């Protein structure tokens, strides 16, 4: 199958390598390459992997993504547009309603920043597809081949919330682990010994629970901005909960010992 990928950051590059591994022809477009958006017009599916950075108010800035979708609409792209970029819940449905000449779905990724391509090919736990169209769902399942262990058919809103659920829960675990690390330090207990004992209860894995002097709070491109985006969304929804704000505030106390991407 001939696929397009717009945006060759960590996510776009991982998608490119992964789909080439499956055997597809991949046509990339990125502002750093000598390419144009017209290059993807004859592809069956185009994956949008452009940045959705944090806005000044903490919300998710979808400006770049919206401009790409608008351009594809103006060019009458006839393939499936699969949004990989993280977006606020409701965005995909808004794009579907706005650009009725396009076929748009949301396909979140759950890749770790430091090993995204490896995860796409060898650690692809879940393929979640947010669409109302069963044909689109089946087409996305087909293009991923045998890489995903599980597939899930969701609505666009559900898939968007799932992406934030994944990242914010990761941030919550990191912050909880760091707080308990401080408790252990004050009580002259070995945090790793306690953490490893807890893992043996079978109630959790040790993912995101490792803490040591050189590995503290979360960093990277995703967890900080996504945590603040959900905090901003809570305000928009008039939900008065402090948990997410507290996660971000407490993480700032540990951030100085984090290498970029280590906790992604």
Locate each region found by the language model.
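Rossmann-like NAD(P)(H) cofactor-binding subdomain of soluble oxidoreductases
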Residues: 53-115
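Short acidic/histidine-rich motifs immediately flanking catalytic phosphotransfer sites
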Residues: 41-45, 76-79
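Internal alpha-helical scaffold of NAD(P)-dependent oxidoreductase catalytic cores
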Residues: 22, 94-107, 113-207, 233-239, ...
